[in-house]
């Protein structure tokens, strides 16, 4: 509902004022100009992640359709849905964090993946963080997961007790020997590879992030069926879970996709470059500057109706 209000001032510029006298017309022009400049100024405001933590319920959509806004690392979502705590082949963990909300496409994807995992004879799939009720930036843990199109799936498998699932911090399964920079063969098994493969085969998936050592292991054991490997991308960390990212829905004009993944299976020189030591004289990376949030995301936090979804 607030989405229409956020855009109303733009539409208002084109209202026919021919029947209004000059003084009233001038006052309206001044008022509209003030609103526009206020809106443009607010584009430079960077909201605190704490503001998004206060959003406790999904932001209702005026037309009933979910709307991911912005990018995976700078965005929000209107009309998110909660993933049920348990379903066929899956269980949500760390529910105390209130990060089990996502775009309907993500909710359906996770339910679908749980069913496929169960049909393949895999243990219960454990689903970690998706997004907060309104998406947005996190105080801790994630740079992305902001539009409800990212989800973490643990490499520990098997159903947990309800008490463990509610607060399962420290109960993950590390499958990489961090010192040796390779998969720990004592804990890695074919179930891990099968679950990642099933996750990547879904056409709605654009990327899956895993530790570089896990990608190497998958490249070594994939056999001839390698059509899914290109979606599996090496990234820092991700040694006790993998991170699924879905493409922007076709009916989401405010959602910004990433560039397509490169061609090939991703098992060549680029992968092994992750294990090379830094080159001498390599420049130190500059501190990242946090960009302003998309204007519509700012409007969520400033909406007159915000009491409906705040704590």
Located regions from the model:
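N-terminal signal peptide c-region/cleavage motif recognized by signal peptidases
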Residues: 42-44
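Bacterial N-terminal signal peptides that target proteins for export
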Residues: 25-34
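Extended, low-complexity, intrinsically disordered C-terminal regulatory tails
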Residues: 52-63, 109-142, 209-229
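Catalytic cores and adjacent binding grooves of peptidoglycan-active enzymes
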Residues: 48-51, 167-311
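Extracellular/periplasmic catalytic domains that process cell-envelope and extracellular macromolecules
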Residues: 118-120, 144-149, 200, 235-238
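Active-site acidic/histidine clusters and adjacent loop/turn architecture
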Residues: 56-128, 188-197, 202-205
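Acidic/His-rich structured neighborhood in mature extracellular/periplasmic domains
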Residues: 132-185, 244
